[in-house]
Swiss-Prot record:
SS bond list: none
Originating species: Mus musculus
Name of the protein in its database record: Sterile alpha motif domain-containing protein 12
Coiled coil start-end: none
Entries under Pfam families matching the protein: SAM_2
Length: 161
């Protein structure tokens, strides 16, 4: 899968951007959106009446008022970020275990290192619930690895002659 995520160039009137959203997870006004919803959209610089860049706009209507940014790496997540993830991906366990995650200072880096034994020591007694959480963590690891590979691919494309 070839990925060109974002290319920026500086010119006297502003910054030129070209973006391709294949397989990249984007943050749009705080909500995670898979790139499928904006696939094959072209974003371009639109000058205002004075000739200066006003904003990036695309064919997608959501791009009109949304700021688009890549989500931060899981290793940099705070406890709050982890609790948001837990609520979204483990809604049945969230009420039971969010306090335990806070007490044990589970940040993104710690989340990626969770094991069955660690979850058990945190008070998650039922094996099926531990397995569900670990399955979600595994999926998160896979998404993070894909993201890292895309960034590496992008960097190697930009550096090659």
């Amino acid at each position: 899968m070839a990925v060109e995520a974002l290319h920026c160039g500086l010119n006297p009137r502003g910054i030129d951007h070209s973006a391709h959203a294949d397989g990249i997870k984007l943050q749009i006004e705080g909500e995670g959106v898979e790139s499928q919803s904006i696939k094959n959209r072209t974003f371009q610089k639109v000058p205002d009446q004075k000739g200066t860049p006003k904003r990036l706009q695309g064919e997608a209507e959501t791009a009109k008022s949304a700021t688009v940014k890549l989500s931060k790496p899981v290793a940099l997540w705070t406890q709050q970020d982890v609790c948001k993830w837990l609520k979204k991906h483990c809604p049945n366990q969230y009420q039971l275990y969010s306090e335990s995650f806070k007490q044990h200072d589970i940040t993104g880096r710690a989340l990626l290192r969770l094991t069955d034994k660690k979850l058990e020591r945190m008070g998650i007694a039922q094996e099926n619930q531990r397995q569900h959480i670990l399955q979600q963590v595994l999926q998160l690891k896979v998404r993070e690895e894909v993201r890292n590979l895309q960034l590496l691919t992008q960097a190697s494309v930009e550096c090659s002659p």
